[in-house]
């Protein structure tokens, strides 16, 4: 429905400059809806935010008509100069701004720039009209979801502020707001070690899934998956981690192996710590038994008083309450990173410090050091900001200075005792300088503790000389060591330490991706998905399947309900049993969130018709085809798109496929579009699955270039009811093509199709045929106009006495009907009025009696409104003489309608139930027949749930 735009309101706004006051519009930009599209989607291949905005009166005010707006925006965000926009050159957006562009477009660019300023590299965006006057879809790329969403909200607020900077209601404090966004980005971003591993995996085309808001990440899909948490991996030994977290045990094991370690004792009281220090001798070290990141570590303690003070700090950081007292080893601090038993990098860690200049205080020197753009909060950047906490202030006092004292020129003041990067330390790469003896000691230490990735901390005078000669020791072994000091050393060459970790997880020749077959279209998706999954399962594949009925993994239902969206796809890709994924991809999921993965190896599009028009901003079949076409655009060069040659919109999708195209077609007559398209495609060496007719029946064949290979007669496929269910003939063609593209041989396809039926337990709610006291009952989920057209054709064929020849049933449509066809019909309330009427009109030509019901979810309609539209269609068709229906009425409650139909039916009749709750109808039919419902692959049909439209 079009929105009525109010008359423009103006306000007096002080625009600065020469002091003049100018008339400007009201700040009426507002967000109507926001969607996060996490995979390939209708708007872009990359993850984007779709922000639907309403300009209000700003629709009449492009940027060049708002006094002072452009100059104020550029003054706040001069880096907008880098935006090329549609002009394709630097400064392009500024040109558009000065020429006049609309507020939605401006908000899009501001949202991108805010993210860039927060440290996120994003570039792509676009703004398009959304239909109603003044409403626009602002599409912009994001990396971190919360950052992208907040950037959009801030962009809208900033636009309104710049439109009316004197209005306190719209005040926008730029610097604090940007700082807040930066903090959000810091919290959401991966740490540098995790990000290094992700970057390396992505460079090898290994997909990743973030499993929590921290550092738990899955690399690979299905049975190939591996996990990391920071730098711990799926291969990391739990015992090894336990040993490394117990510093005393680590020390004992290394000492038993003859490796150099300091003498140490574990204590749990202050007095015990002092006694241990006396035995070990001064200077000594006090540290938590199970601490990390250097917290609570006190070095070079020279007296009992120092030990007493250090104990209280160490015990606070100890989870167990135990503390280690050990001999102090003098020297430099080195971290040896061991990956897969080999040293990958060595860094010298330099504790945080500042150097006096005879001008600034210690506090000011720290502020100067923290202004280095390489320093950030936590692991945000390559260096961490130095904190002036109590420990740092105490250390400064120990050196004879106060925190606000001016330090003599050239005097170095330590701010931390350890060289941990997390306390503001710096690093120097020493990888190529390390002596082979020291390298061997580090590798042995990692093997003894039992870690695939380990950080071995050496204290020694020089890593370039053997520690056994110079007097050094291993003071700690770390599980999950940080990579930042190696990938971004303050001095020296960076070491690409993520590479050997990924080599460890995915050795050369190992897989990371499982085949993904994605099926979309208006009708036939669910049955096609089931057919493909059935074929592949018979080949021995462990298939993970999603559909509108649920998620099935290796033949077992693990989640019931409508599971045709991206989150369900993610569930399958995270399942370690699955080696092949077959996904039903619904229109709604693509529009709401995009695909649940980055690409599919096989994309199948069954058809595109006018169902769901008017929903989600999609108003034409062309737009709907673009939505369905997302799966085709997600096909890589090595993949395949399986397209319906009989459908003009689907056939055209082949132009957007990076891989090969396999067609399927029901057309058998030269001159028909589908037949001619297949002819042209195969003449160019392409492949197609199509039909050929002969005296023996209707045959599915594979045409591959000039060759034609027989697959299977359609009447031998149980799901086609002897070839009379033409929709399932089309679905079988699509499934055969998809399975072939996924690596199935023709004999696999034959076996799969010959053993696939539409029984309730193999395909619930999809053309299930039951016998109830001589009455044939069909349960189906026919919910749109094209589906009714196909169902009507099926009913007409089923009501005619079949012709048989050579053991086959012919797909006969003409002839004399036997018995009556009674239909229980319903269409979702969110379909257009005209579609609901057409649905009824088509049904009127196939059924002798029609009972119209409604879904429980009326989708915004009044009770009886949808049924009334269907009845109007039936009545119109009957009035025009285009109907065979003799009786039609409304019974709105679904089960009451089904019971009414079953009561009216007599032996020989066909009752077709187009219902929302297929399980309840099945139970009712079985109850009427007095039959048992047990003895099937499912314990009870209640394990299933009828799909939602």
Model-derived features with residue positions:
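Adenine nucleotide phosphate-binding catalytic loops in nucleotide-utilizing enzymes
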Residues: 617-625, 629, 639, 659-789, ...
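Residue-level signal for inorganic ion chemistry
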Residues: 201, 457, 546, 584, ...
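Walker A (P-loop) phosphate-binding motif
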Residues: 231, 508-557
């Amino acid at each position: 429905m079009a929105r009525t735009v109010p008359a423009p309101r103006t306000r007096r706004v002080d625009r600065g400059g020469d002091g003049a006051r100018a008339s400007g519009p009201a700040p009426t930009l507002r967000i109507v809806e926001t969607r996060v599209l996490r995979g390939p989607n209708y708007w872009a291949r990359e993850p984007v935010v779709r922000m639907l905005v309403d300009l209000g009166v700003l629709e009449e005010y492009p940027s060049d008509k708002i006094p002072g707006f452009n100059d104020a925006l550029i003054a706040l965000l001069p880096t907008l100069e880098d935006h090329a926009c549609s002009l394709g050159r630097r400064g392009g957006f500024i040109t558009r701004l000065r020429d006049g562009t609309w507020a939605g477009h401006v908000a899009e660019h501001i949202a991108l720039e805010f993210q860039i300023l927060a440290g996120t590299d994003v570039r792509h965006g676009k703004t398009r009209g959304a239909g109603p006057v003044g409403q626009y879809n602002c599409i912009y790329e994001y990396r971190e979801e919360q950052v992208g969403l907040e950037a959009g909200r801030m962009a809208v607020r900033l636009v309104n502020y710049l439109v009316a900077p004197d209005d306190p209601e719209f005040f926008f404090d730029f610097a604090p707001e940007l700082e807040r966004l930066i903090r959000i980005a810091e919290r959401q971003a991966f740490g540098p070690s995790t990000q290094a591993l992700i970057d390396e995996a992505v460079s090898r085309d290994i997909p990743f899934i973030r499993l929590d808001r921290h550092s738990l990440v899955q690399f690979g899909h299905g049975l190939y998956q591996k996990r990391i948490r920071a730098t711990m991996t799926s291969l990391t030994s739990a015992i090894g981690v336990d040993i490394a977290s117990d510093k005393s045990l680590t020390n004992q094991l290394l000492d038993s192996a003859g490796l150099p370690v300091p003498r140490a004792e574990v204590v749990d009281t202050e007095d015990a710590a002092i006694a241990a220090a006396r035995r070990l001798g001064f200077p000594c070290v006090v540290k938590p038994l199970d601490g990390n990141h250097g917290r609570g570590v006190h070095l070079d303690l020279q007296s009992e008083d120092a030990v007493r003070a250090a104990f209280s700090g160490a015990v606070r950081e100890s989870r167990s309450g135990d503390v280690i007292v050990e001999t102090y080893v003098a020297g430099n601090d080195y971290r040896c990173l061991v990956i897969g038993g080999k040293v990958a990098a060595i860094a010298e860690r330099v504790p945080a410090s500042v150097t006096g200049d005879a001008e600034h205080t210690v506090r000011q020197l720290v502020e100067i050091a923290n202004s280095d753009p390489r320093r950030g909060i936590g692991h945000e950047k390559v260096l961490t900001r130095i904190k002036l906490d109590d420990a740092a202030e105490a250390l400064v006092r120990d050196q004879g200075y106060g925190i606000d004292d001016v330090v003599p020129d050239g005097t170095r003041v330590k701010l931390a005792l350890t060289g941990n990067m997390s306390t503001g330390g710096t690093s120097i790469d020493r990888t190529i300088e390390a002596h082979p003896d020291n390298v061997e000691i580090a590798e042995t230490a990692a093997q003894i503790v039992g870690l695939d990735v380990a950080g071995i901390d050496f204290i020694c005078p020089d890593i370039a000389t053997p520690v056994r000669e110079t007097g050094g020791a291993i003071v700690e072994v770390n599980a999950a060591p940080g990579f930042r000091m190696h990938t971004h050393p303050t001095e020296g060459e960076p070491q690409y330490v993520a590479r050997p970790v990924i080599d460890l997880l995915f050795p050369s020749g190992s897989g990371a991706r499982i085949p993904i077959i994605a099926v979309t279209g208006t009708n036939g998706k669910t049955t096609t998905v089931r057919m493909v999954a059935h074929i592949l399962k018979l080949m021995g594949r462990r298939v993970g399947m999603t559909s509108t009925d649920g998620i099935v993994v290796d033949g077992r239902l693990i989640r019931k309900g409508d599971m045709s969206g991206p989150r369900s796809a993610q569930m399958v890709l995270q399942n370690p049993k699955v080696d092949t994924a077959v996904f039903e991809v619904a229109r709604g999921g693509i529009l709401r969130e995009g695909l649940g993965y980055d690409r599919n190896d096989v994309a199948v599009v069954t058809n595109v018709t006018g169902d769901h028009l008017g929903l989600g901003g999609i108003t034409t079949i062309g737009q709907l085809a673009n939505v369905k076409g997302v799966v085709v655009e997600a096909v890589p060069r090595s993949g395949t798109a399986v397209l319906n040659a009989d459908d003009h919109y689907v056939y055209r999708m082949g132009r957007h496929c990076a891989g090969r195209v396999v067609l399927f077609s029901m057309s058998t007559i030269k001159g028909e579009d589908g037949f001619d398209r297949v002819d042209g495609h195969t003449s160019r060496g392409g492949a197609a699955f199509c039909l050929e007719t002969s005296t023996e029946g209707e045959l599915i064949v594979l045409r591959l270039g000039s060759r034609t290979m027989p697959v299977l007669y359609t009447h031998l496929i149980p799901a086609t009811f002897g070839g009379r269910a033409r929709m399932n003939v089309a679905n079988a063609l699509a499934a055969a093509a998809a399975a072939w593209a996924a690596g199935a041989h023709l004999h696999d396809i034959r076996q799969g199709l010959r053993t696939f039926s539409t029984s309730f337990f193999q395909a619930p709610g999809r053309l299930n045929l039951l016998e109830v006291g001589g009455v044939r009952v069909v349960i189906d989920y026919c919910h749109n106009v094209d589906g009714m057209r196909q169902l009507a054709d099926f009913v007409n064929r089923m009501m005619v006495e079949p012709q048989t020849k050579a053991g086959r049933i012919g797909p006969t449509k003409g002839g004399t009907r036997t018995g009556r066809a009674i239909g229980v019909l319903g269409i979702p309330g969110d379909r257009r009025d005209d579609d609901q009427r057409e649905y009824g009109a088509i049904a009127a030509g196939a059924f002798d009696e029609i009972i119209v019901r409604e879904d429980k979810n009326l989708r915004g309609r009044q009770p009886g409104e949808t049924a009334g539209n269907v009845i109007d269609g039936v009545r119109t068709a009957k009035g025009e003489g285009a109907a065979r229906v003799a009786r039609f009425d409304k019974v709105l409650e679904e089960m009451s309608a089904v019971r009414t139909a079953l009561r009216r039916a007599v032996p020989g009749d066909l009752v077709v139930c187009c219902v929302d709750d297929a399980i309840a109808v099945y139970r009712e039919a079985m109850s009427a027949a007095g039959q048992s419902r047990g003895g099937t692959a499912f314990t009870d049909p209640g394990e299933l749930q009828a799909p939602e439209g």
